[in-house]
């Protein structure tokens, strides 16, 4: 430890930061990391304990799939560990190109552009498309990256109440902006519900706006073939700008934007988070390719996940705590206070089950919750074990 290091000497800035951290601790908002040993999966090892995990967004159980591991290993042998340059210099390798083409075919969309992360993709898309003369209309429960991107773009930001189509239409009707962009999570990451995408698209068509969808939690899971929210609703429109990630259902890392080729070409030329960063390692792209292939062909995983979701909701008998309305793999249980949510999470941990307590500012004040993430790698027995413990804790 380096507590005596000169960098640890007190300064006004460090004193102020320490005071803010103390306030967070007092309010039950201080976050901590846990070190996971071994692979991500249904069972994980933390501090020597084997825990049943309902934490990860590995919705199809592909993060530790042998096909992804083999693809990553084989690619690393021929490409090395890192790319050493941005995509537009010399970092765009054959694995990246192959993945973009595979995603074009899989999604049935002509243009695809890879990004390092979903956060970077959202920053890149919104700041490239919107500026001071434009307006962004954002759901109040959107992911932080969408909010940050809107602020960074310097466009006029109008936020509407969650899934409030009437409020959104009023804002669109009043706007005189040069370009109007409606932005929404396709699946809301902390509530698990879906955006009313067909109705959003209808409003965009009526008011000459465009619709950007962050389908991080729908890609690979929704739709008969896992093509996400667009397949789920049967939508195809040049007004839709589609973003999805490769680090959740696909089991690897990264993200992509899909839509018209003019859109992706424009983003390649202008999106600063794409231009000014080192390309992600080619082995990661190879693993993502293997994940996309499994999404396309292994329908049994999605079917099993849907059965687990139905089983969980049918068997949940919570009364004091609120199971939110969600038909996705994200099943939030609202506890209310920060302190009680953290305490319930700790009690679950004592019973060998890992479920995160989600608190403000990630969720609205007074709605601290357990965010239960189901995976196709879980069994019905795993789900029943979780529910049995939750029911006992609520009654205690």
Swiss-Prot record:
HAMAP family: BioF_aminotrans_2 (MF_01693). PANTHER family: 8-AMINO-7-OXONONANOATE SYNTHASE, CLASS II AMINOTRANSFERASE/8-AMINO-7-OXONONANOATE SYNTHASE. InterPro entries: Aminotransferase_I/II_large, AON_synthase_class-II, AONS_Archaea/Proteobacteria, AONS_Proteobacteria, PyrdxlP-dep_Trfase, PyrdxlP-dep_Trfase_major, PyrdxlP-dep_Trfase_small. Keywords: Biotin biosynthesis, Pyridoxal phosphate, Transferase. This is 8-amino-7-oxononanoate synthase. It catalyses: 6-carboxyhexanoyl-[ACP] + L-alanine + H(+) = (8S)-8-amino-7-oxononanoate + holo-[ACP] + CO2. Homodimer. One of its GO terms (biological process) is biotin biosynthetic process. Pfam families: Aminotran_1_2 (PF00155). The keyword Transferase applies. Pathway: Cofactor biosynthesis; biotin biosynthesis. Substrate binds at residues 31, 143, 362. Belongs to the class-II pyridoxal-phosphate-dependent aminotransferase family. BioF subfamily.
């Amino acid at each position: 430890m380096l507590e005596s290091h000169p960098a640890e000497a007190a300064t006004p800035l460090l004193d102020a930061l320490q005071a803010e951290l103390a306030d967070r601790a007092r309010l039950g908002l201080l976050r901590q990391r846990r070190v996971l040993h071994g692979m991500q999966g249904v069972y994980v090892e933390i501090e020597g304990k084997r825990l049943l995990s309902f934490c990860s967004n590995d919705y199809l159980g592909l993060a530790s799939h042998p096909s992804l591991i083999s693809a990553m290993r084989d690619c690393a042998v021929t490409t090395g560990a890192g790319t050493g340059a941005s995509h537009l210099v010399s970092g765009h390798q054959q694995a990246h190109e192959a993945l973009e083409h595979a995603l074009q075919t899989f999604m049935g969309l002509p243009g695809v552009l890879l990004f390092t992360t979903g956060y970077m993709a959202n920053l890149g898309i919104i700041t490239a498309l919107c500026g001071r003369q434009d307006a962004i209309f954002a759901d109040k429960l959107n992911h932080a990256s969408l909010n940050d991107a809107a602020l960074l773009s310097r466009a006029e930001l109008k936020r509407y109440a969650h899934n409030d189509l009437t409020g959104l239409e009023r804002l669109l009707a009043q706007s005189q902006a040069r370009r109007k962009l409606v932005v929404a999570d396709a699946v809301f990451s902390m509530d698990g519900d879906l955006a009313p995408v067909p109705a959003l698209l209808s409003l965009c068509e009526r008011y000459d706006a465009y619709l950007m969808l962050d389908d991080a939690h729908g890609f690979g899971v929704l739709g008969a073939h896992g093509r996400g929210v667009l397949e789920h609703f049967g939508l195809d429109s040049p007004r839709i700008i589609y973003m999805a990630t490769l680090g959740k259902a696909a089991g690897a890392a990264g993200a992509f934007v899909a839509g018209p080729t003019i859109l992706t070409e424009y983003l390649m030329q202008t999106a600063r988070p794409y231009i000014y960063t080192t390309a992600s390692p080619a082995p990661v792209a190879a693993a993502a390719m293997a994940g996309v292939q499994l999404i396309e062909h292994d329908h049994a995983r999605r079917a099993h996940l849907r059965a687990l979701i139905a089983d969980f909701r049918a068997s949940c008998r919570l009364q004091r705590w609120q199971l939110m309305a969600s038909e996705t793999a994200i099943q939030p249980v609202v506890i209310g206070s920060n302190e009680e949510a953290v305490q319930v999470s700790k009690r679950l941990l004592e019973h060998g089950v890992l479920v995160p307590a989600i608190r403000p500012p990630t969720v609205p004040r007074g709605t601290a919750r357990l965010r239960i993430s189901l995976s196709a790698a879980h069994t019905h027995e795993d789900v029943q074990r979780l529910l049995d413990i939750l029911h006992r804790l609520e009654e205690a």
